[in-house]
Amino acid sequence: MECIHKFLEEPGFLVNHHLDSFNQFVKQIPEIIKNQNPLTNLKNKDDKNVFRYACRLWVGTKTSSELVFGVPVFTENGVQKPLYPNDARLRNLTYYFSIHAKITFEIEIDGVVQEHTPEEMVFLGNFPIMLQSEICILHNVPPEVRFAMGECRSDPGGYFIIDGSEKVIICQEGRARNTICTTKKYSDKYYYSADIKSYSDDGVTFPRVAAVRIATKEDASSSVRTKDGVTLHEMVVELPDVRLPIPLFVVMRALGVLTDKQIIETCLLGENNFQEHFHESVCDAMGIYTQHHALEFIGSFTKYKSLQYAVHILVKLFLSHMGDQLIDKAFFLGHMVKKVLRMALGVDPVSDRDSFRMKRVEPSGVLLHDLFHDFYHKQLEHVGVEIDRAHNKNKNFFNEPANFPTLFLANYHQFFEERITEKGLITGFKGRWGATEYTQLVGVSQKLNRLSFNSAISHLRKCVLQLDDSAKVIAPRLLHSSQWGLFDPVDSDGADVGTHKQLSLCSRITDGFPKKRVLDVMAEYELLILPLHTLTVESATLVKLFLNGQWVGCIEEPEITLYTLVECRRTGILPSTTSISWNIGENTLYIYTDAGRLQRPLFYVNHKRKLSYSPERLGSWVDMTRGDIKKPCMIEYLDADESNSSLIGFDPLENFEKTLYTHVEIHGSSLLGFMGNQTIFVQHNPLPRNAFSCGQSRQAVSVYHTNYQNRMDTMGVVLNYGQTPLIQSNFLQPFKSLPCGANAIVAIMCYTGYNTEDAILFNRSSLERGMFNTSYFKTYEVSESNGDIPLVFQGSTNTDENGIVQMNTEVRPDTVLMRMAQGDSIKNIYPNRDQEGRVDRTF
């Protein structure tokens, strides 16, 4: 339990998954811009159909380092002032940072290249800041100082302020990248299927789906039938940007594997008991025996109908996570074929799509990264259109060699006037998340629920699976064993059970780091990797090495490799987010460094069969989870993939020498979430009681914000005399200043059947002393469309000369709150029905 206390002392522990991912996103903005540089524009063809002029445009110069991030400001009465988060709330502004960039032009005229970098920067746009992130003014500010700035002492941040409204980006649950998924009953023609969505490492190429399908027929006379009663026929491959499925052997020959024997060996790698199932596929590729003919065949089904475009598809679009080498893609395609064959013949089960081994969670930073990338790509396309439009307006002038540079140097500010990236992000926060109709998501950005402090934190820790309401599927709603320790098992969300989940207390979402770091460490420790092009039939017994879904090669000493890499992670040589697992059944070593993996902390049993935990090593949570050469970490994080190959004990033992345990749980409370840990004796209650406790505690009247007096919320309910519960969870200690109830002494009169469900008798003096006394706040807001109207409101005792009700005015149904004038007519704003009280504040 001491370790859990150390975790609770960490700043921002409730929303670190948002803060860390947003900080990572901001650091990656220069990389996003760099990957899409340069923008090339060609002009003025000569007689030989060759362009004489060319201009290459680099945003942020050639290194993308000339980017300036500006602080948030606003203008009042012509004076520019710094913008603080609470000012943004009160003034209905967006709390943002700006980006300015220098532009480098490389202008080529008849082979002569000149380079220009104007001093004046272009404005790329204003982009929302996550509160308490590294670029926020509240970052690392003490609670009392935050309180003086209008913030809550206990508010962890992790949300945005858009037009004065607090917005939260909900974590989205989705399929893992570069992961093969097998399926039965794919279609009437293709019963068995294996598909993969490939993402390139540089992020420049958009993700593409590739698939292997097996055609089947119901042939009762066949002696070779699967357990599903169907006969396997030809295998085909679905390629990106190719209209029809292509026979497997044609694709293999296009990738450079020519003979039937080589193709079968590439697929099976010595597992010869599946050879008979390739007969139909061999016949399906009759007449195409060379790489050239195979590329021509594939090209005929593309929009350009060319061999060159077929090469482009295979090199850049098909299995882009495998790099540019065609032979590597051939081996990976063979691996997919073998996987779908083993599934079809009942050797392996169908892929479990609901397992978190095959899922990732995208926090706010990852979602913003993808949205920024897509809209920035659109903005560059728009810049190209603007350049063409400016050129066509005065084509003869700009076609002169001396005038061509002025097309760019004199007009480059106009090219970036349309801030598509900024507008796209703001539109996403207001409901339409996604740059295209294919990437749009519903409900990603939502208004932060400020009904209570508990509801706000639960909203920030929610994870959503996008599922169509019309889909009558049950499996995604069930509690999956791979979710153990990653999600709260008792905090369900009513009708959205299973699709709306709450992160457990200590779980985190990985940020990701380049996989090259793992390869560098393996090279440094001389852990040999056999490249794919060196594999032979005899290599079937070697252990495959997959790194972020990419088949890197094979290794001869898996035990040594596994031990070395795990020790490197525990000693800080590799990041603690690295996942290393050896699946002996699949004869594969999986290593993951990508973002979006859910991890949870555990003690581990070291190679000496000693538990990593010892009271003498207690320190800060960061110190216990990060090790060095001299002192390995005491706690390590595991994801669902690594947990699948581990044996985890629930209680620490005195001696682990006679056990097979690899890890031990830290404490039972780490399995529950924010609300589950506030439920008392959760392990002794039936599930409905725990579920009701989580749901109803979120809706309890409370002090939702310690600085509610300085806010103008649309609606707010405050418990005036809240109390700390007599029986409380240790987890409640950091939030005692935000009570959500009162300690009531209840007597139940059960003698005659009169029960609490019938009625409650209150002690009058308790109510008079303030028991359950609450304050309800309602904000009325109007916008002034024209500030030049000289009318001064007079003749009303409630409103001032600006037409706004005065503070401390008693409010009744006929009280005028605001008076609005248009011409000679005046419109009065009255309170809603049955709302009475006093004016607390005007702004």
Question: Where are each of the predicted segments found?
Answer:
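Conserved phosphate/anionic-ligand binding catalytic regions in large, soluble enzymes, centered on
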Residues: 154-175, 359, 477-514, 738-740, ...
